[in-house]
């Protein structure tokens, strides 16, 4: 490995390697050869683009073997890097030796043609080798790093919250149950139903839908914290935007109100998008050309815009007065649909916008009740192209109000005793938000289906690979 040069280094520092002998290793993407010479496109995984290798029958002792190698065979190449400013590629490697590391079978599914995303989902173990998914998952990696960098540079503490939980943060009940009981013959409680006291944890336990409640504990000790981990929703939603397993970024900030919350959300979103654009120009150019023609313009617009702000009540009025006929009629009290959110950002504000102060009946129990008694200090960040990308709120710090809200929603206080206890010991104003990581990657890449931005998607009826 020591003497192998990564393809990324060759592209980023071409002049440093010009006219010098280099060694690369990678997989064959394309190969064409005549009796005298041939061309191989090699990708080593370190960079989106391939390297063209030129091999000559007069120099390569195993020329006949190499010229017949199937796509996806792995090879090592030793040769001289020659700059080619007048060609499509900035340089090529003129091979002196080619070593076959591993032969690929001739029935390799990813041949040199454009495959549909639907087909590629059926071979999720191989699709990272395709151009679109090579670009997608490299962007995913860089975006994840950018999120950590943003919060670390701001002094936030990275906090790991539990995957297994006995509480439902959203109060929606759409959770995956975790049990070691024999479900063919489970123990039955005296009052009927399954006796979870005999289960592994001694109570009903589920996969987490959010790390927020646990994150609040740490925010009230470390001031500013964030989580970044997998979450699970048992929603039977077979849509392009829903998955049963996905990743969430959830910062929590003490001594911070809703205004502070929106400021951090806006800064984070702009930072991550700009970071990916700077670090992955080849990938973004690919998406802009082949996936979403207006992508680059839209991303630049988000980065360079000052986000708008409007209350839910004002937004409803604007939509009603727009004269637009929506599939879902707009009236106060409804949860805004994607068509409403996109109309606000694309037609009315023509930029990203925060919608604040939603009706309490469509929001979670932990959101701070406003003085009007009807709305809560919640915010959703809407962006052109998709609508909601971030959801957050100022948290309810008043113990009596929080208890009353839980009673309204028939939530059992005993399940949240520790969360309620936070309000007894130095409670303060605090806020936070959640960003679905896959939703962000869809936005940055223009990919239209959440199944195509997760390495191995888990959706209704699908748990392959």
Swiss-Prot record:
GO CC terms in record? cytoplasm
A GO BP entry is: asparaginyl-tRNA aminoacylation
**Top-level EC class:** ligase
Q: Which residues cross the membrane?
A: none
Q: Which domain of life is it from?
A: Bacteria
Keywords of this entry: Aminoacyl-tRNA synthetase, ATP-binding, Cytoplasm, Ligase, Nucleotide-binding, Protein biosynthesis
Reactions mediated catalytically: tRNA(Asn) + L-asparagine + ATP = L-asparaginyl-tRNA(Asn) + AMP + diphosphate + H(+)
How this chain assembles, per its entry, is: Homodimer.
Q: Which GO terms describe its molecular function?
A: asparagine-tRNA ligase activity; ATP binding; catalytic activity, acting on a protein; nucleic acid binding; transferase activity
| Family named by the database record | Belongs to the class-II aminoacyl-tRNA synthetase family.
**Which InterPro entries does this chain map to?**
Aa-tRNA-synt_II, aa-tRNA-synth_II, aa-tRNA-synth_II/BPL/LPL, Asn-tRNA-ligase, Asp/Asn-tRNA-synth_IIb, NA-bd_OB-fold, NA-bd_OB_tRNA
SUPFAM superfamilies documented for this protein: Class II aaRS and biotin synthetases, Nucleic acid-binding proteins
Q: A Pfam family this protein belongs to?
A: tRNA_anti-codon
PANTHER family, per the entry: ASPARAGINE--TRNA LIGASE, MITOCHONDRIAL-RELATED, ASPARTYL/LYSYL-TRNA SYNTHETASE
CDD domains recorded for this chain?
Answer: AsxRS_core (cd00776), EcAsnRS_like_N (cd04318)
Major location category of this protein: cytoplasm
E.C. numbers:
6.1.1.22
**What species is this protein from?**
Clostridium perfringens (strain 13 / Type A)
Q: What is this protein called?
A: Asparagine--tRNA ligase
Its annotated compartments are: Cytoplasm
């Amino acid at each position: 490995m020591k003497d192998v040069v990564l393809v990324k280094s060759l592209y980023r520092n071409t002049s440093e390697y010009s006219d010098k002998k280099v060694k690369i290793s990678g997989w064959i993407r394309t190969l064409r050869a005549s009796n005298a010479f041939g061309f191989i496109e090699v990708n080593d995984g370190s960079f989106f683009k391939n390297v063209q290798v030129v091999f000559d029958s007069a120099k390569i002792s195993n020329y006949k073997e190499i010229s017949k190698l199937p796509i996806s065979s792995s090879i090592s190449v030793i040769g001289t890097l020659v700059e080619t400013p007048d060609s499509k590629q900035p340089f090529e490697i003129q091979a002196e030796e080619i070593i076959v590391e591993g032969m690929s079978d001739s029935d390799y599914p990813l041949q040199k043609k454009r495959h549909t995303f639907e087909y590629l989902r059926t071979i999720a173990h191989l699709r990272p080798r395709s151009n679109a998914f090579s670009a997608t998952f490299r962007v995913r990696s860089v975006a994840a790093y950018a999120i950590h960098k943003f919060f670390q540079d701001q002094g936030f503490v990275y906090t790991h919250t539990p995957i297994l939980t006995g509480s439902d943060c959203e109060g929606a009940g759409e959770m995956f149950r975790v049990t070691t009981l024999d479900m063919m013959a489970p123990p039955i409680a005296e009052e009927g139903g399954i006796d979870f006291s005999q289960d592994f944890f001694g109570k009903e336990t589920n996969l987490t839908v959010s790390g927020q409640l646990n994150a609040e504990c740490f925010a009230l000790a470390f001031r500013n914290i964030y989580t970044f981990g997998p979450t699970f929703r048992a929603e039977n939603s077979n849509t392009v935007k829903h998955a049963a397993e996905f990743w969430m970024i959830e910062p929590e900030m003490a001594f911070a109100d809703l205004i502070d919350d929106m400021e951090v959300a806006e800064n984070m979103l702009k930072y991550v998008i700009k970071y990916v654009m700077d670090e992955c120009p080849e990938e973004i150019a690919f998406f802009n050309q082949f996936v979403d023609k207006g992508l680059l313009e839209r991303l630049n617009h988000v980065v360079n815009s000052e986000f708008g702000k409007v209350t839910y009540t004002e937004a409803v009025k604007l939509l009603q007065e727009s004269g637009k006929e929506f599939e879902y009629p707009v009236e106060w009290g409804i949860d805004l649909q994607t068509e409403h959110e996109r109309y606000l950002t694309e037609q009315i504000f023509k930029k990203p916008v925060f919608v604040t102060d939603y009706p309490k009946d469509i929001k979670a129990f932990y959101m701070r009740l406003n003085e009007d008694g009807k709305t809560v200090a919640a915010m959703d960040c809407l962006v052109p192209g998709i609508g909601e990308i971030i959801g957050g709120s100022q948290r309810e710090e008043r113990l009596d109000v929080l208890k009353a809200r839980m009673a309204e929603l028939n939530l059992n206080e005993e399940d949240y005793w520790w969360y309620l206890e936070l309000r007894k010991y130095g409670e303060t104003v605090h806020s936070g938000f959640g960003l679905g990581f896959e939703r962000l990657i869809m936005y940055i890449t223009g990919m239209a289906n959440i199944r195509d931005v997760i390495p191995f998607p888990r959706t209704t009826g699908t748990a392959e690979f």
